[in-house]
Amino acid sequence: MYSLSQRLSVAGWSRVFTTVAGMVLTCAALGHGNVTPQPVDTHTLPQLSSDWLTDNPYSTGSATQEAIRVGSSGFNQNCARCHGLEAISGGIAPDLRRLDAECFDMEESARADCVKTFQAYFIGTVRGGRTRDGRVYMPPFDGILNQEAIWAIKTYLESRRTRE
């Protein structure tokens, strides 16, 4: 049986642990700041029509490097709070560098279909957000980020892709 001083010591350490754990969790939650969307300057990218495309227009071609630059800025201003700086997730939200990683072990025709499926998922998620049981897990960016900005962010993520 423990003496009174031993029980108080255990209770004291338990309170210290609980307090420190609470502070760490609070800092982690608040460390990502608010999620007020920031504008993304896309004037240097080829402008797209008002109809949403199903394929990333910046994945290949002369605008790819500029799209990566614009997308990096857009990602780090709007997405990094949850998905991690430079797209390296800290565990709060999915690591978007791995979004379509499973596609690249497939044969060519299956790979194209897989990439198209993930592009549709990405665009749908960014535009419409994600909620579950009334909780917002990702805010919708439709009407906030234009098509050029969203595809530039996707192009940036493609440049950061990893299979790990």
Language-model features: locations:
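N-terminal secretory signal peptides that target proteins for export/translocation
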Residues: M1-G12
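Gly/Gly-Pro-rich "capping" loops immediately C-terminal to redox-active cysteine motifs
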Residues: I68-S72, G84, I88-R127, Y137
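Axial heme c-ligation environment in periplasmic c-type cytochrome domains
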Residues: H32-V40, G90-L99, T125-R161
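N-terminal signal peptide c-region/cleavage motif recognized by signal peptidases
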Residues: T26-A28
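The canonical Cys-X-X-Cys-His
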Residues: G71, F75-L85, M138, I153-L157
